[in-house]
């Protein structure tokens, strides 16, 4: 068997916020809540698969609880999540060959004010930059689940997949920056896991616009020129076509 995730040091336990709820008595297990929902890709002697469940936890500090009760949820910065990742394992023995984490140190990016296709993000970039030093480790809890199997271009030796929302999902104050490589279409070298390129559909996502559907590979003709393309149906309601 291939073990994808080791239990986190800090996880759900008897001190969890809702552990005393009679409706879920004895349901607190200590599980991280992380798993894989997509079929793995078997390619060139490797099993390639991503993890999910890293972008939706209720990430609250114990200090935010008052008298054992939680008075509010919206507006709190997050912790106790983890980066999502795509990983390759040796198909013969399960040994991990490479891992690409979807959030990394430096995930703040360029603090862009528009998407790559020109839609204003209406971000307070000045405030985000001022807060960045305070949240320098936010990428360690950054989310970026992978909800589908990757597409493979055997001619180029590349795989393509989309990533989920950053964590915490709808609260961006604790994660300044573009939150690379969440909500992105990502291309990796299949043999090494090295990043070749990415296209971030929504930087600093606040709305849960996961790149959740599987990419499709095809050729497209533009002005008489045939271009190898990768297409992806997005949650923003557009179908994106990128040059592979």
State where each predicted segment sits.
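Noncatalytic, solvent-exposed loop/strand surfaces
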Residues: 1-244
